């Protein structure tokens, strides 16, 4: 009987990597950690979900099942790619070395990413633009709903979608036209993440390191997936949760846990 070869590795989420910008990302420190794993004789790097957490921060509560987290984009990488200058980062280098101020990181990084996206629009090469167009076409099946949801989120002051007007009253060509630049930048963020992630993954694989990923069991209520497909979840007529996810009492938590995701409508 053949068995899988014995392997070992380390669980360390990307955000837990050290770095000067308040939160770990898929930049130089991630490549360095690959080197460390290789030198230790490890072959696996386990990480938590990489999805776009929005303002929730929790990797198990994501805005989209498919979109990746722009907060994990390497700012140093954006400098190397020509979309940022070192001067752009001077105003965000005053972080604590032992604690993460998530709100500050969230605010600062998205301001910097906005600058990078503006520079991408202005100066990306023809070859890069072709890759970007191909990325958008290949991922249209989820990207179109994601950018629409995020645009409506912005227009509704980041409020939960159950407080919005009905979809047919919100969605129209005018919204797309009036927010075209914002929408384009959402696409660029997703593209930049994938470009950087593929470089990290390729480097890790060359060093004999494979990633062990993770995905949430359920889908977050305030997500594009539930907003666009409410019939797939246990919701009432107002979009509120009828049955939610959780965990019964166990050794780790005598009271049990409420996770807050809507249950699936298996029918």
Where are these regions (language model features)?
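Short, solvent-exposed turn/loop segments enriched in Gly/Ser/Thr/Pro and often Arg
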Residues: 46-56, 215-221
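Short alpha-helical segments and helix-capping/turn motifs at coil-helix boundaries
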Residues: 28-35, 134, 195-203
């Amino acid at each position: 009987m053949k068995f899988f070869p014995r392997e070992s590795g380390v669980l360390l989420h990307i955000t837990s990597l050290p770095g000067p910008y308040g939160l770990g990302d898929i930049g130089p420190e991630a490549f360095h950690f690959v080197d460390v794993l290789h030198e230790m004789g490890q072959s696996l790097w386990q990480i938590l979900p990489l999805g776009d957490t929005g303002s929730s921060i929790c990797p198990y509560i994501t805005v989209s099942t498919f979109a990746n987290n722009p907060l994990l984009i390497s700012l140093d990488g954006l400098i190397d790619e020509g979309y940022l200058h070192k001067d752009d980062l001077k105003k965000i280098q005053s972080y604590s070395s032992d604690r993460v101020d998530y709100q500050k990181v969230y605010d600062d990084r998205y301001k910097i990413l906005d600058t990078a996206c503006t520079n991408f629009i202005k100066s990306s090469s023809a070859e890069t633009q072709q890759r970007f167009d191909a990325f958008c076409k290949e991922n249209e099946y989820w990207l179109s709903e994601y950018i629409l949801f995020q645009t409506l989120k912005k227009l509704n002051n980041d409020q939960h979608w159950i407080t919005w007007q009905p979809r047919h009253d919100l969605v129209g060509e005018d919204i797309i036209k009036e927010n075209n630049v914002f929408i384009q930048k959402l696409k660029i963020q997703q593209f930049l993440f994938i470009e950087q992630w593929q470089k990290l993954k390729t480097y890790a694989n060359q060093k004999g390191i494979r990633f062990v990923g993770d995905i949430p069991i359920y889908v977050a209520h305030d997500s594009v997936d539930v907003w666009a497909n409410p019939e797939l979840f246990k919701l009432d007529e107002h979009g509120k949760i009828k049955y939610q996810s959780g965990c019964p009492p166990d050794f780790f938590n005598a009271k049990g846990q409420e996770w807050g995701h809507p249950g699936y409508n298996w029918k």
